[in-house]
Amino acid sequence: MPKHSKRYLEARKFVDRTKYYDLDEAIELVKKTATAKFDETIELHIQTGIDYRKPEQHIRGTVVLPHGTGKEVRVLVFAKGEAAKEALEAGADYVGAEDLVEKIEKEGFLDFDVAIATPDMMRVIGRLGKILGPRGLMPSPKSGTVTQEVAEAVKEFKKGRIEVRTDKTGNIHIPVGKRSFDNEKLKENIISAVRQIMQMKPAGVKGQFIKKAVLSSTMGPGIKLNLQSLLKE
């Protein structure tokens, strides 16, 4: 059983673990229990009803939060020529082709949060799959990170577009803001994220798609959300 810090145990006293909280109350509580000295990230954890044994039910896509995540997103783009120029002008942090592939392979360079590639670059970066894949950084058409429209993709990821995927237990974890966000912005981000996840329901999933939702801060306890009221928002 993992040992929790004194701060965590103190914060947990405020949370009734048998209760399912309405969203407004949960937001108040998650901010109250985020007591670390840094600006903690507020995270939404969604348990889905997918069968992970069936690859066609795996979820991978992107969610655009109206107020972003509060985190500065470092974007790397694999592109050449005009596309490379457009990516730089759109605000990409790193742009290159074979040179970036080599930097990642030989130097272990991973100082970025999102990797985008033009379709013609996939042949070049294919060998990075073993490095970027396990870290969720490998460009993919499903996540909108393989595209000819690199400038648009860079701008969206910089603004708050985030990649989401189900883990091996069928859960999705989404950063929805920072403790410093006002309550209304957090609420709008959470509602928007849930609506977008609902639209990703695989055709083969039977029964309830979203089975449970929990809100927490980086270092704080989980706060269970009242699904009925959340899905009505």
UniProtKB/Swiss-Prot annotation:
SUPFAM superfamilies: Ribosomal protein L1 (SSF56808). GO terms for molecular function: rRNA binding; structural constituent of ribosome; tRNA binding. GO terms for biological process: regulation of translation; translation. The keyword Lipid biosynthesis does not apply. One of its GO terms (cellular component) is large ribosomal subunit. The keyword Ribosomal protein applies. Keywords: Repressor, Ribonucleoprotein, Ribosomal protein, RNA-binding, rRNA-binding, Translation regulation, tRNA-binding. It holds the Pfam family Ribosomal_L1. InterPro entries: Ribosom_uL1_bac-type, Ribosomal_uL1, Ribosomal_uL1-like, Ribosomal_uL1/biogenesis, Ribosomal_uL1_3-a/b-sand, Ribosomal_uL1_CS. Belongs to the universal ribosomal protein uL1 family. HAMAP family: Ribosomal_uL1_B. Part of the 50S ribosomal subunit. Binds directly to 23S rRNA. The L1 stalk is quite mobile in the ribosome, and is involved in E site tRNA release. This is Large ribosomal subunit protein uL1. It comes from Thermotoga petrophila (strain ATCC BAA-488 / DSM 13995 / JCM 10881 / RKU-1).
